């Protein structure tokens, strides 16, 4: 008798065919990678096909692969990752779609398929700058409206670009350039044979 994950994998391969760029099992979960051009069609089929039945989107996030694998990674930089749940079939699926342009990452919105994607897509836009084409209200959700950049991108400076503080003379919050100085932290090297009673 086939396990639940083997059944799901067989159903996905039969339903999606060549539209599945890859389908990998790791840590007891399947990850499906699809092209951005097939993304909406595949998402609808994942929801509507009774052999799959993913009626719930439980999470969606952005990923920046710029420094993935210590810089050895040579694929697209940004991806949107969905986590889907089928209550009827009691199985889960991770779906990954890569944006083709690293400078302006654009991925179709799945809000019309799973309305729970609304705020998740806004969060991925706010933090990673991934534009979800067709989203009804794509605006920042976590950072300030005047915020510059996208803070979860790997090239975003740790200290940010500006800092805000309350100015008692102006009686309002003001923005100013960052005043934090970058520091080089040198790791401590212990050169003793016995440190803290430990034998080497």
Curated annotation (Swiss-Prot):
Pfam family, one: Complex1_30kDa
UniProt-listed InterPro entries: NADH_DH_suC, NADH_quin_OxRdtase_su_C/D-like, NADH_UbQ_OxRdtase_30kDa_su, NADH_UbQ_OxRdtase_CS
UniProt topology in membrane: Peripheral membrane protein
Main location: membrane
Assembly and binders: NDH-1 is composed of 14 different subunits. Subunits NuoB, C, D, E, F, and G constitute the peripheral sector of the complex.
Function of the protein: NDH-1 shuttles electrons from NADH, via FMN and iron-sulfur (Fe-S) centers, to quinones in the respiratory chain. The immediate electron acceptor for the enzyme in this species is believed to be ubiquinone. Couples the redox reaction to proton translocation (for every two electrons transferred, four hydrogen ions are translocated across the cytoplasmic membrane), and thus conserves the redox energy in a proton gradient.
The name this protein goes by in its record: NADH-quinone oxidoreductase subunit C
Organism of provenance: Burkholderia mallei (strain ATCC 23344)
Gene: nuoC
């Amino acid at each position: 008798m086939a396990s639940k994950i083997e059944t799901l994998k067989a159903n996905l391969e039969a339903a999606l065919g060549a539209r599945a760029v890859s389908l990998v099992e790791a840590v007891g979960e399947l990850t499906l990678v699809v092209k951005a051009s097939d993304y909406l069609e595949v998402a609808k089929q994942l929801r509507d096909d009774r052999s799959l039945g993913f009626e719930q989107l439980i999470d969606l996030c952005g990923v920046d692969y710029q420094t993935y694998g210590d810089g050895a990674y040579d694929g697209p930089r940004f991806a949107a990752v969905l986590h889907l749940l089928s209550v009827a079939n009691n199985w889960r699926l991770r779906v990954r779609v890569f944006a083709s342009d690293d400078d302006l990452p654009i991925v179709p919105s799945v809000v019309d398929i799973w309305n729970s994607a609304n705020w998740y897509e806004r969060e991925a836009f706010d933090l990673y700058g991934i534009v979800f084409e067709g989203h009804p209200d794509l605006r920042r959700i976590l950072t300030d409206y005047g915020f510059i950049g996208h803070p979860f991108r790997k090239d975003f400076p740790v200290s940010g670009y500006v800092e805000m503080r309350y100015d008692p003379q102006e009686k309002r919050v003001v923005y100013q350039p960052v005043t934090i100085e970058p520091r080089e932290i040198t790791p401590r090297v212990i050169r003793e044979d016995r440190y803290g009673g430990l034998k080497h």
